[in-house]
């Protein structure tokens, strides 16, 4: 009996594994868990993205724009549970750039609210809005939250090179630079943080669109305003089939 016990003890010593060779499980901190949870929640519905530009009424404060959109987002969220809005609103001296990410229904409600204000208020703070690009069924978000920032760039009296470019060229430059800016913010702004603040033009000046580009796109007739965009999507599509022409017959047999 003692022989058997001795064998068991010796076998245990033979199969002991060096602790240094044991596979290490990566430790995940609480912030990483919260960020991953937030990302999963944002993937519950099909994502769409809008790139908007327009003018801002003179003497409009950042607080007014921020409160308007935050209240609008909260109001829409009551009817579209879980469909969070993320994006970036950049305030230039007389114009703006707005990137929005959310569900199709939420984005439509945001545009509808703007159209309603545009019709009812003669001097609404956001004016002459244009939709530059509408991206549908995007795989992932560029932003984790919705941020608003003032761009304080000194006015340089240089030749406006946008006048010699085509709309396609200006739009390509616009999208390239905004995507680079979005990726920069994605890497630097943490979940729950205050965002880039009003010194974004100092942190990444090479990624800031000049206001002349925004104004050029605002004046371009190739882009739709929200009212025309919504009208196009709400308009029923009538397709005349061959059977509609052949049958019923125009006269009785």
From Swiss-Prot:
Task: Read off the InterPro entries from this record.
Answer: TEX47-like (IPR055308)
UniProt superkingdom: Eukaryota
Pfam families per UniProt:
TEX47
- Protein's name according to its UniProt entry: Testis-expressed protein 47
Organism this protein belongs to: Rattus norvegicus (Rat)
Supply the source organism's classification.
Eukaryota, Metazoa, Chordata, Craniata, Vertebrata
Gene symbol here is Tex47
């Amino acid at each position: 009996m003692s022989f058997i016990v001795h064998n068991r003890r010796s076998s245990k010593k033979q199969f002991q594994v060096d602790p240094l060779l044991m596979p290490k499980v990566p430790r995940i901190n609480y912030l990483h868990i919260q960020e991953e949870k937030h990302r999963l929640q944002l993937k519950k519905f099909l994502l769409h993205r809008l790139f908007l530009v327009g003018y801002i009424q003179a003497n409009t404060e950042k607080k007014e724009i921020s409160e308007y959109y935050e209240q609008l987002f909260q109001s829409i969220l009551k009817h579209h549970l879980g469909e969070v809005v993320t994006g970036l609103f950049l305030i230039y001296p007389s114009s703006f750039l707005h990137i929005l990410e959310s569900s199709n229904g939420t984005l439509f409600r945001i545009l509808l609210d703007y159209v309603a204000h545009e019709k009812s208020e003669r001097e609404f703070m956001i004016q002459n809005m244009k939709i530059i690009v509408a991206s549908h069924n995007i795989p992932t978000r560029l932003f984790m939250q919705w941020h608003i920032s003032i761009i304080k760039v000194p006015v340089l009296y240089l030749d406006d090179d946008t006048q010699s470019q085509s709309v396609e060229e200006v739009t390509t430059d616009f999208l390239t630079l905004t995507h680079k800016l979005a990726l920069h913010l994605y890497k630097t702004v943490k979940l729950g943080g205050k965002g880039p603040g009003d010194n974004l033009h100092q942190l990444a000046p090479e990624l800031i669109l000049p206001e002349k580009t925004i104004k050029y796109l605002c004046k371009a007739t190739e882009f739709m305003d929200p009212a025309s965009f919504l009208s196009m999507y709400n308009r029923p599509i009538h397709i005349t089939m061959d059977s509609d022409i052949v049958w019923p017959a125009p006269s009785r047999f």
